A protein has these predicted regions:
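Patatin-like phospholipase
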Residues: 1-46, 54-184
Length: 187
C-alpha cells in the first residue's frame, strides 16, 4: 500500500494523453490513486486517454485492467498481430513499416471496426452520464479545421462512443470516415 504525499481530503482532476501503450500505464496510475484514497472529480483525455477517462467515470477498474492486460493490435484495428509485433520490435526493416503505412493509406486507411466493437462492449453511456466524475475529451473537426473540447456528458444521447472513437483516430493512418451519427468528420 502506498502512503500518499497528496492531500486526500481534496478532489483532483486527471489529464490523460494519447499514445496507445500509455493507456496501460494510465490504468496503473489510476489503481494507485484509488488505493491511496485519492478522490477524482474530473478527467480530461484524448485518444486512449479519452477511453480510459470513460472507464474511470464508470469506475470500472477491473474491466480496464482486464482489457489492457489482454489487448492486441488486432483488437484495435484490422491488422496482423505478428506483423505489427515485428514492426514495433524492430524485427522488420523500417522501410517495410513505411511501405505498409503507405499501402494502408492508399487503400483508404486501416479499418478500425475492432475498436468500434471494443467501445460497444466496454462503454456504458448511462454510467458515464450518471457518474459524479466530469469527463472532457479532445478531438479535431476536419470540416471546421479546429480542435474541439467536448464535455462528453453533454453530447447528444447515443453519440458518446462516436466522439470517443473520433478522439482516437490517427489521421491519415485510420480510415477517415464521417461519423454517421454526428454528420461531420472528426479525427
Amino acid at each position: 500500500m502506498l502512503t500518499p504525499v497528496i492531500d486526500t481530503s481534496k478532489e483532483y482532476g486527471l489529464v490523460l494523453e494519447g499514445g496507445g501503450a500509455k493507456g496501460a500505464y494510465q490504468i496503473g496510475a489510476w489503481k494507485a490513486l484509488k488505493e491511496a484514497g485519492v478522490k477524482i472529480n474530473a478527467v480530461a483525455g484524448t485518444s486512449v486517454g479519452a477511453l480510459n477517462g470513460a472507464l474511470i467515470c464508470m469506475d470500472e477498474l477491473e474491466m480496464a485492467q482486464q482489457m489492457w492486460s489482454n489487448l492486441t493490435y488486432s483488437q484495435v484495428m484490422d491488422v496482423d498481430d505478428t506483423r505489427m509485433e515485428q514492426l514495433m520490435e524492430g524485427e522488420a526493416p523500417f522501410w517495410e513499416a513505411v511501405k505498409d503505412a503507405f499501402r494502408h493509406m492508399s487503400e483508404g486507411g486501416v479499418d478500425v471496426t475492432p475498436l468500434k466493437d471494443m467501445l460497444d462492449k466496454v462503454v456504458d453511456e448511462e454510467k458515464i452520464r450518471n457518474s459524479s466524475i466530469d469527463i472532457f475529451i479532445k478531438t479535431f473537426s476536419v470540416d471546421a479545421m479546429k480542435e474541439l473540447d467536448i464535455d462528453l456528458k453533454q453530447v447528444e444521447p447515443g453519440l458518446m462512443k462516436d466522439f470517443l472513437l473520433a478522439s482516437a483516430y490517427i489521421f491519415p493512418l485510420f480510415k477517415n470516415e464521417k461519423l454517421h451519427e454526428i454528420g461531420r468528420a472528426h479525427v
